[in-house]
Amino acid sequence: MRKLTLIRHAKSSWADPMLNDFDRPLNKRGETDLPLMARRVREFGLFPDRIITSGALRALTTAEALADTLELNPDQLCELPDLFESCSETLLHVLQQQPDHFHHLMLVGHSPGLDALAYYLTHEALKKFPTSAVLHIHLSITRWSELADSCGTVVLFDYPKMHPAPL
């Protein structure tokens, strides 16, 4: 069995209309949600063998915070700039190419690619895949190359608005 954790980047800023979409940083809510989400990932015991992330600033910032909170080694973080704006087929192909000595992968990316990949793997329709969402899937495969339609089961789905701020 393999495990896959899909994480959508923390909320990003649209404050600078001149900034390229790839280079948008986190906004105030993203900066608040990210450490809380990273701590929950740790509390859930989701320690991946590798984090694969889009190279977009908001995704990379999210992945680096996760790696730091999970106390991963720098070589466990794999930045792939081409994952920015990738469709689910591209994400699937990247995952299918991963070495089989990795049993748990974490993929930090963007909507709608993550949404479509999650549905393809589990056939569970999520109402939405909000920013800072964590979707953990158990996969009925022994090798990453076997990743296919409906091979996964959702074990956990968590996002910031499920945890209202204390009054």
What positions do the PLM features span?
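Non-DNA-binding regulatory cores of transcription-related proteins
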Residues: 98-106, 111-133, 141
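Short, glycine/charged-enriched secondary-structure capping and boundary segments
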Residues: 19-22, 65-68, 92-95, 120-124, ...
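Short phosphate-binding loop-to-helix
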Residues: 83-99
